[in-house]
C-alpha cells in the first residue's frame, strides 16, 4: 500500500524566534538578557526561585525610603537630613578601587563571551539549528503556509540522458533560455561558483543541443502543447504526448506525435488515427522504432518506412492487457505504467501479458463527475456514473501473467516457460531485465515468501531457474519487491570474466548488496554487510571502474548517506560527509560520472551536482540552496525536535520523534497527538527537514506531536519487521500503546488528552490502536481513508503480509477492526473517506460503521468526500481534510466532545427572555 502522496510522510525541523521582530535594531540587549534568564529559570527550578527573588522588588513598609530612587541613593540619608562630608579612609578607598576593578574586568569578560557566542543576536538573525533546545521570538506556523507551499523546499529533478557519442553528464532541460527542449552538459556555465578542476580539452563540456525551440508545435493548422516528451536515444527525434488524461496513480493515456529535430516537422504516432488514445509509447534502443499500447493491444511503429505500423497482439481488451500493467500490477508490483522491455540491440521486444478473465470486478460510483467524459443518455442524467475495475482481493482469483517475446525480424510472438516455475494461479512476476541477449525474470508465489530467478534465452527459446530462495525458511518473512537489479556484462580487460548482475539480498538479517557472477551462480559475492541496510540498491554501477554506488543507513537508521564499493566488495567509501547528520537521495548520470546529490535534512535542504570517483575531474555546483526557506526558518517558531530510541517492554526498541512547542515549559501539562503511518517497511521518523501539519500543531496549537516507527516498519533489520506477518496491526498497536503509556508517565504530559491519527495504513493503525487500547490510554483518534478489514484490500499487497485468508482466518480476524464495544470505550473518534477511493475502498469504512450501528456505539464523527479518491482532493477536499483534523483535535483537547456525550436540553424556565 503506497501512501496517499508521493512524498513519503516527512518529519520536522526547527528554527528560531519569538515575537515577529526581524532585526536586532528592534530588540534591546536588556530584553535578550532577560529572555535568557527566563530560559535558565525554566530549566533549573532552584535557580529559578533565587533568580526571582533577585528580580522582584522588595516589599516596602509605609515610611521606608527607596534606595533606588533617582533623588536618593544607597549612601544618602533619608530626605531632610543634611549631608556631612567626611574624609574616606585610605585603606577603605583601596578596597573599593580593587572591587571596582574586579567588577569592570568581570563585566568586560562577560561582554566578550556574550559577543563571541552570538547571544547578542536576535533569534531571527541566527541560522536554523535542528538540534536547538529552545526557540526565541518569531512568527507562528500557519495552516495557510503549510498548504500554500510556503514551507516547500525547492528541488530540481535532472533528466539524465545518455550521450549517443559516448560522453557523460548530459541532461534534458525544459523551458530554458535556449529553447523548450535542450540537451545540456551539466558542467555548462550557469554563472555560479564551481569547483571545476582537472578539465582538459577532452573533458570540456559538450555544446547544448536544441531539440525543440518552442513549447508548442503546429499540426494541420492547430496549435498543440506537449504534456510529456521523450527524445530518441540518438537525439534525432522526440516523442511528444498531448491531451494527457490521468488513469490511475501512474498511468495515463494521450495522443502522441513524433518530432524530427532537424526539420522540426511532426507526424502522428498512429498515422491513420491522429487522435488515437495511446496508453504507452517507448523508443527502441536503436531509435528506429517505437512500441506502443493502444486499446490494450501492443504495436510497433517502424520509422524507416513511412506509415509502417505492425500490430503484434489482437486479443487485447477489457480482459487482456499487453505491455501495460492492470490496476493491481501498476499499484503494487511495477509502481509505474510500463510493462514493455526492449532488448539492447532492438531485435526483441518483451512485454507482459495479463489475463484478467477470472478477476472479480469492483464498481466505483461517481456522483458528481463523469470520468469517462461521456454524456449520459437523455433521461439518465440523474444516475451516477459507474466505473468497474478488475480488482483482486485476498483469496480471490489473481490476474494470470506471463512474459511474451516478439522477434522483430521474424515478426513472431512466443512465450518461454521454465521447468518448475510457479503455476498460473500462484505466480507474480516482479522483475524483467535484459542481460545482454538473455532475460532475467523474478517470479514469486502469490504470498511472496518463495522467490525464483529465471534466466531466459529468447534466441534459443529456453529458460532455466538459476536461483531459488525460500524466504519463509530464512526468517518467516516475505520478499521485498524492488526494481534496481542491474546487469553486469563480462569484460576481461576490467577483471570481469563472465556476465553477472547486482541485486539486493537478505544477508545475516539485513538487506545488502550481492554480486552474482557468473549470471547463473546462486551464491553472491557480498559487497556490503553489517547491522545496517541499503535502500533501493544499487543506485548506479560504473562498469569502467567496477564501482557500485548505493544509499544506506550505515551511520544511523534514520539517516541516509551515499557510498561506493568495488565489485569485489572492497574499498567501501562514502560520497557524502558522514561526520555530519544527513539524509541524502541521489541520481546518477548515464555513465555514473556525475551525480545530483539532494540533501533533505536535518538542516535546510540543498542540491548540488558533483563529479564522482568514476571520472578524473573534480566538479561541484550548487543548483539549489533554498536561501529563502532558510530565511523563513529564521523568522518563524518551528517546533523543538527530540529524536531518540524508546525502549518498550519485552526488549523492543523503536525510533521516535517528539515535536515540542517552541516555548516548551517542562512544568506544564501538554496533550499529545501521535502521528504515524506504520505500514510494513515504511519509515516516518527520519532526519528530513519538513514543516507540515504536525509542525503546525506543535508550533501554533502548542501541543506535543509524537511519532514512533513500531515493529513492522523499515530499516532496523528483518526481525524488526517480519514479526508482524499474518497479524497486521496487532503488534504495531501494542507498540503505540506502550509508547503512549511511557509518555503518560512524564511530568509534562497530560495523560487524559492523548490522540492518535493517520492516513491510509495509518488510518487503519489508528483504529486498530483505539480498538486494542479500549480507552485505557488514548482518548481520541482520527482515521483518514482507513482499511478496516484486510479482506477488502488488494491481494498482492495483503497476501504478502497476511497470507491467504483461507489459510489464516484467525489472523485476518485478529487484524480486522470489528470490536465496536472496545471503540466505544474511547472518548470520541473521527473517520474520513473519499467515496471514489479506488485504492482503499469506501467499503472499509462502511463495514465498520455497520459494526458500530449493531453495537449501538455513537461516540464518533464521519465525513465523506464525494468522488474523491485515496488522496481526497476532488473539489478542494484535501485542505478540508486538514481543516477538519485541526478543528476536531482542538475541540477534543478542549473537552468539547465530553459535553456532547450526554446532551441535555436547556431548562427553558431558567432562560432569560428579552421582550
Curated annotation (Swiss-Prot):
UniProt catalytic activity: Release of an N-terminal dipeptide, Xaa-Yaa-|-Zaa-, from a polypeptide, preferentially when Yaa is Pro, provided Zaa is neither Pro nor hydroxyproline
Compositional bias per record (Low complexity), positions renumbered to this chain: 15-32
InterPro entries: AB_hydrolase_fold, Peptidase_S9_cat, Peptidase_S9B_N, Serine_Prot_S9B/DPPIV
Cytoplasmic-facing ranges: 1-94
Topology in membrane: Single-pass type II membrane protein
Keyword Transmembrane attributed: yes
GO CC term (a single one): plasma membrane
Cited SUPFAM superfamilies: alpha/beta-Hydrolases (SSF53474), DPP6 N-terminal domain-like (SSF82171)
Topology Vacuolar: residue spans: 116-915
An annotated GO BP: proteolysis
Cross-referenced PANTHER family: DIPEPTIDYL PEPTIDASE 10, ISOFORM B (PTHR11731:SF200), PROTEASE FAMILY S9B,C DIPEPTIDYL-PEPTIDASE IV-RELATED (PTHR11731)
Family indicated by similarity: Belongs to the peptidase S9B family.
Name of the protein this chain belongs to: Probable dipeptidyl-aminopeptidase B
Provenance organism: Metarhizium robertsii (strain ARSEF 23 / ATCC MYA-3075) (Metarhizium anisopliae (strain ARSEF 23))
Gene that specifies this protein: DAPB
